[in-house]
Amino acid sequence: MPQSIYRVDKFVVPIAAREEFLDRVRRIHAFLKEQPGFLQDFVLEQFSGPGEFNVVTTVEWASQETFENASAVVTARYREMNFNPQETLARLGIKADLANYKRLEA
């Protein structure tokens, strides 16, 4: 049975960039929800505690294969839109930590 893959992206978002950033995240997640293998997502905003990252997004994919397929579709879509995520993050002054995770038994 394939193991779920979790895409977890953590961001330090300046207050001045918050609305534009969250609007972009919502649009991206709406597109991700249409992709085969999408299981669930969360967009989380820190409200207390000493953590560095104030916005965290997660997407659970059914398998490594569905994650890779969705990544290819998203990359192609960005190319069509002439959208460069790294340039947007730099322009908005956002620090990002992007990674894929698998679940461990507790």
Feature roles, as predicted:
Residues 31-39, 60-98, 104:
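An amphipathic, aromatic/His-enriched active-site/gating alpha helix that lines ligand/cofactor pockets
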Residues 50, 101-106:
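A short acidic, often aromatic-flanked loop/helix-cap motif at beta-alpha or helix-coil junctions
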Residues 5-12, 43-75:
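Short, well-ordered beta-strand segments in beta-rich or mixed alpha/beta enzyme
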Residues 24-27, 73:
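Residues within well-ordered alpha-helical secondary structure of globular protein domains
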